[in-house]
Design a protein with these regions (language model features):
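Secreted/periplasmic serine-hydrolase-like ester/acetyl group-modifying domain
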Residues: 101-211
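Membrane-embedded segments
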Residues: 44-129
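Hydrophobic membrane-insertion alpha-helices, especially the h-region
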Residues: 1-11
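Short extracytoplasmic
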Residues: 28-54
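Alpha-helical transmembrane signal-anchor/signal-peptide segments
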Residues: 12-33
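Substrate-gating cap/lid alpha-helix
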Residues: 219-252
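Histidine-centered active-site loop/cap adjacent to the catalytic His
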Residues: 266-288
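Active-site segments of SGNH/GDSL-like serine hydrolases
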Residues: 200-228
Length: 288
């Protein structure tokens, strides 16, 4: 029985998952001909920013500060940066993010489909999501179709409209997410603040025109997170402002840019239509 399940899982990974794997597309774009204008961060940037012609979005969901810093350094190792958007969101310093080191990230960017004995089941990111794949496979009648659109500029655009959900659902979802994003004391953030600062310093020394951006979240999420730990969040926002002043960068706080729930796919991410709508305005706000 175990061998049958393993064989079926390997088949699904090869025929359904790998052909539409966003990470492979993301790595291929990262390793393509480099440009001087780019954006970096996690899913808030990946799903919420559609870059203009000539700029690429190199953000990837759940990316930690050490991995983002490695990526920025690697990308601009052999060419000069120009306009660079760097995510500046408080949740990047939440405890659940403070254990994610660089690890094998560089190796994944060299070969995103590296596997043992040629088995896709041996690829960690696939193995970690295997239960979710099977659940989705069963729920959708044997079909596995990603709803994410990976654009030529690197954005990972998502459908969804949280305004269609009942108010109680939105409030509970926001509170659950806010608890995950709750910040610990500043002392626990020290090492990651230093990594973040060094990333900005290195970019600044290379002549980058840096814009630090706090990305939009829904009004439900803003309310929920303030009730949990407003003081620590204010400390992070002060840190972002101080860093921007230190390197003479632009800091744009767009956390509350919109109260229209139809702009959000879930409680703290813009949907694809909103990303397309707001991105040109953000570029103007950042760089004129």
């Amino acid at each position: 029985m175990g061998l049958i399940l393993a064989g079926a899982s390997e088949y699904i990974l090869r025929t359904k998952i790998a052909p539409q794997d966003e990470f492979i597309a993301h790595v291929n774009l990262f390793n393509s001909d480099p440009v001087s204008d780019a954006a970096f961060g996690d899913s808030h940037v990946a799903r919420g920013f559609v870059p203009p012609q000539g700029m690429l979005n190199h953000a990837y969901p759940s990316e930690s500060i050490p991995r983002m810093a490695w990526k920025v350094d690697a990308y601009f190792s052999d060419h000069a940066p120009d306009r660079v958007i760097i995510q500046a969101d408080p949740h990047m310093f939440a405890p659940y993010r403070l254990s994610k080191t660089v690890g094998d990230y560089p190796a994944q960017f060299e070969n995103p489909t590296h596997s043992k004995f040629g088995l896709y089941l041996s690829i960690p990111r696939y193995r970690a999501n295997l239960v979710n794949y099977w659940a989705s496979f069963a729920r959708n009648g044997g079909q596995l179709k990603s709803e994410i659109t990976f654009t030529s500029g690197g954005a990972h655009l998502s459908p969804g409209d949280i305004s269609k959900e009942p108010p109680r659902y939105r409030e509970n979802a926001a509170l659950t997410r806010a608890r995950i994003h709750d910040l610990g004391p500043a002392s626990t953030q020290k090492a990651y603040r230093e990594i973040y600062s060094k990333m900005l310093t290195d970019l600044n020394r290379k002549g980058a025109n840096i814009c630090m951006v706090t990305f939009p979240v829904s009004p439900n999420f803003r309310t929920a997170i303030r009730t949990i730990n407003d003081a620590e969040r204010k400390g992070i926002f002060a840190f972002f402002e101080q860093e921007a002043q230190r390197i003479e960068a632009r800091y744009v706080n767009w956390e509350a840019i919109t109260d229209d729930l139809s702009n959000f796919r879930d409680t703290d991410h813009l949907n694809g239509d909103a990303a397309k709508h707001f991105s040109p305005q953000l570029v103007t706000e950042c760089f004129g």
